[in-house]
Amino acid sequence: MAFNLPLQNYFSRTTGPAVYSRPSDWPVITDAAAEVQFLFCDLGDAACQIRTFFTRTSGSQNIIIDWGDATTSTVTNNATTDTTHTYTPGTGTPCSLGYTTFKIRVYFTGTGVSVLNNCNIMAILNTASTAVGSPQICHVLEAYYGDSTQNATPVNFYSIIGSSCLSIYSNLQFVKLPATVSWTTWTTTFHSCFSLLKVVMPTSNSAVLQYGNAFNNCYSLLEIIFPSNSTLIQGMQSVFTSCANLRSVTLPTTMNSSTDWGSCFFGCLNLRSVTMPSINATNNLQYAFYNCLQLEWVKFTSMPTVGVNMQNCFQDSANLQTVYFPATVSNPSATVSLNTAFSGCRQLKNIVLPSNMNVSTFASTFSSCTSLTSCILPATSPACSAYNNTFLTCVSLLKITLPAAPTASVSFQSMFNGCIKLEEVTIPSGYILNNFNQTFLSCNSLKTISWTPGVQNSITSMQLTFNGCYLLTSFTMPTSMNIVTSLSSAFSSCRSLLSITLPSSLNAVTDMSSCFSGNIAFTSVTLPTSMSACTNFSYMFNSCASLTSITLPNTVGNVTTFNSCFYGCNSLKTCVLPGAAQLSLVNDINGMFNGCSDLVTLTNFDKIGSLTATPLMSAATFNSNRFKGGSTISFYGPLSLLQLNGTNVKTDVQNVRLLNTSAGQWTGSSPQINITFTNMSTAQIVQLFNDMAAQGNVVSKTINITGATGAAGLTAADRLIVTSKGWTITG
């Protein structure tokens, strides 16, 4: 007859009984004093063998083993029992679930005190067995250990002893223990008893207890009854780890001595609620409720009086809605680490932390709490050193009040990253900030960021700080930001930003790449003269569609790249660049003015790269720039190739001047000038011819004027200006 494992009946994340229900046709396990009782099954009506093993440490009485099939064995006056019994088919008590049960009793004769330790009962693998689960393998269903008079100690229910013995405790369903014991440890006692459904613990224990891993991986466990007096329990680490079917647990209020609750309920997928006892002595709650997917609420009646680690405590408990804390803690100097404590609690809507909780770190504390709308932090947390990722992707958060400033500098990196509904933030006085990267990245609704007087800064980088703050209309950087080295993408995609005030002391900034990229609203910006250290202006004003004018200060003498700096600034009319000395190190202007269709006045563009050895105004580096008709481009740099091809790259230039007449600038095999399909008039082309003629004895060069607007109006005399010098005109 087929055997249905208890595991198959009970292990379910969403269905099955909430408490243990014992089959009515099992033989009764009684509370017999001075006895150890087992109930086991044979997985079918077949011959099977059971081996018992006990260690007797005192006393001299005979040990009687009642095998439950009307036979007994007597072990006399020896310290150790190691007895094997073979059952005959047809004996035992049939069970409606399809197997036969046997009740084994182990007891004593005579008087006096005897002690049994290491009480084990194991199935013997029949020689005909080929795999676990074959009908010849027996399984213990229940176990009862008699009262403390005999002190029978259960140890290692899961152990495998010898190559021919298999642990039968994977199908153990119920365990009842003596009322009074003096055991000092339950560590790993029921570890991996996969089918264990209920355990009744002793009502009294006179010794200090360690429960670490006691029920670890008992994923069918439904019910655990602790004694009402549990004052001596000290270690609860990993006790219920992976008890996936445990739905509720009652922890006695007397369980107030435990120092370690780390990973206690880790992976209890169906646990709904827990009221914690006093945890005054606790120093570890790390991963205590990690990945408790159905957990709805937890109540803390007190908080530790010593420093405690709550890192990852509730992480990924996706259904957690409420955590009750006391209003205050009794020892405000005791620090609490909340690193990633509530990360991934997607149903958590509001939380109130004790007003004087001294949090040492808020790093990632509420990251991905997507339903969080309100969070009341402590009024002060002087030991806090980190706020990085605190509210990362809290997409429902509307407002937050930060605690008073801690004593040390703190990181705000990605603190509000992705808080798309956050509207206002005030940083209180006294904060010393050391990292501001991505702090308000994608805060689409942020309108106001206030720095109260007294905020100090040790910030060296503001990369992506306000990127994507669509509703931010103005911002004034504090004057104390004088050591910031990077503003890369700091204000990019701030679509409503109309004004920004930069401090006069940006002397440490080296990277302004994409700083204002995509700011379609503001029309002008004043850059401070202190930016002498800056080297990177790439994409700085990319797609600033409303920018009409810009003047770069004469102090930016170390810039090396303007790659796509004003790309897509289609309203830009005036751009004033610094002089030759300030632009001498520039080596990349690719796309610098691409799409600047309204640019009329461009000052000092001819000075770019004037002191470098590599020419810039070439097809590779210049042709992607586009200018409005009417602008004048004057070239000064060391040119070996000038390409302004209006057809291929839409370079809409009307006037080109060559200002450097040094013959040394025209070396190479066949350098040429290409102004094809530009809008240059006849007079402007003639003016360019005169510039070319002034190149001294440079001969055998080519100028291509095909398709240029004024090419058709050139006279023979006009052409002679350059051909008489040995130049060739194409077009």
Give residue spans per PLM region.
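Extracellular/surface-exposed low-complexity segments
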Residues: 2-5, 9-13, 710-731
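Short acidic/polar micro-motifs centered on Gly/Asp/Asn
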Residues: 43, 52-91, 98, 107-111
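Short beta-strands within extracellular/lumenal beta-sheet-rich domains
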Residues: 22-44, 81-83, 122-129
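Exposed beta-strand face motif in extracellular beta-rich ectodomains
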Residues: 3, 100-102
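Enriched but not universal
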Residues: 1-35
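Extracellular/surface recognition and adhesion modules
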Residues: 65, 541, 688-689, 722
